[in-house]
């Protein structure tokens, strides 16, 4: 497995911080389900960087390619609102701003079967390399799949499982999901928050509702956990509906806990 962009989340109004980031949350879930996971990225020479390396090593990650460089670890400052909702205040890029995988990192990546990335890991130009090498690429486009700034249509052809985030299941959304899948992915998935998710595989659409949670403590990690559950289903050879259900079940468990995994 492979995870890329990582940062520490710090809840500034209650003095709590924890390792997070799309790929990190995803990787921690998979590691806890018995999947071998590696992190290829960078942290700074600071307390956050030390804690990140310690935490990921404790989760069983291979951190041999988690570099340590002069500067600050990437941090997302958040606040806790009404005891539940996390509000993003500021993103501090730190050493991630200039990070690039070196040749050794790139060779290490290609030793793995599944690669997870997003739009912010400074590695979009490597997507064709991974695709040509026959790797399974899982990519989180979040809410930006239709944003012209990110030119996601240029990336879809090199992705196997494309995940996007929207609010409502509309005919226009289905047209977009179908269009995205036709550009290359085996499956394109749109998560819809409390309205569940839809997926398209080139032949038909699939729908999956949510799994009700006993309580809602944190919705920040819902998307990453859904992708992790879906990915584990792919690894286990499950069909698309079962993968979607696995994602929904894991997401339901996560929103009932304080941390995003």
Task: State each model region's role.
Residues 1-18:
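Positively charged, low-complexity intrinsically disordered leader regions
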Residues 3, 37, 63-64, 137, ...:
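Hydrophobic anchor at the start of a short beta-strand
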Residues 13-14, 35-113:
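Conserved N-terminal subdomain of the carbohydrate kinase-like
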Residues 23-32:
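Histidine-anchored nucleotide/phosphate-binding helix
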Residues 114-179, 195-197:
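Conserved beta-alpha-beta core of the PfkB/ribokinase-like small-molecule kinase fold
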Residues 174-261:
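Conserved phosphate-binding/catalytic region of the ribokinase-like
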């Amino acid at each position: 497995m492979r995870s890329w962009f990582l940062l520490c989340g710090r809840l500034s109004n209650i003095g709590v911080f924890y390792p997070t980031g799309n790929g990190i949350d995803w990787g921690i879930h998979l590691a806890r389900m018995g999947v071998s996971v590696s992190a290829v990225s960078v942290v700074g020479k600071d307390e956050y960087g030390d804690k990140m390396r310690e935490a990921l090593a404790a989760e069983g990650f291979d951190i041999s390619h988690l570099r340590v460089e002069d500067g600050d670890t990437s941090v997302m400052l958040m606040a806790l609102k009404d005891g539940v909702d996390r509000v993003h205040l500021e993103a501090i890029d730190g050493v991630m701003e200039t990070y690039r995988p070196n040749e050794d990192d790139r060779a290490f990546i290609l030793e793995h079967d599944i690669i997870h990335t997003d739009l912010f890991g400074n590695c979009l130009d490597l997507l064709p390399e991974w695709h040509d090498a026959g790797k399974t690429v899982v990519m989180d486009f979040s809410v930006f799949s239709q944003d012209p700034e990110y030119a996601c249509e240029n990336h879809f052809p090199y992705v196997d499982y494309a995940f996007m985030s929207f609010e409502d299941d509309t005919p226009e959304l289905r047209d977009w999901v179908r269009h995205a899948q036709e550009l290359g992915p085996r499956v394109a998935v749109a998560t819809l928050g409390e309205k569940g998710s839809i997926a398209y595989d080139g032949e038909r659409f699939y729908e999956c509702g949510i799994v009700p949670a006993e309580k809602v403590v944190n919705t920040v990690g819902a998307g990453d956990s859904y992708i992790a559950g879906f990915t584990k289903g792919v690894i286990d050879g499950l069909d698309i509906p079962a993968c979607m259900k696995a994602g929904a079940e894991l997401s339901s468990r996560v929103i009932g806990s304080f941390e995003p995994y």
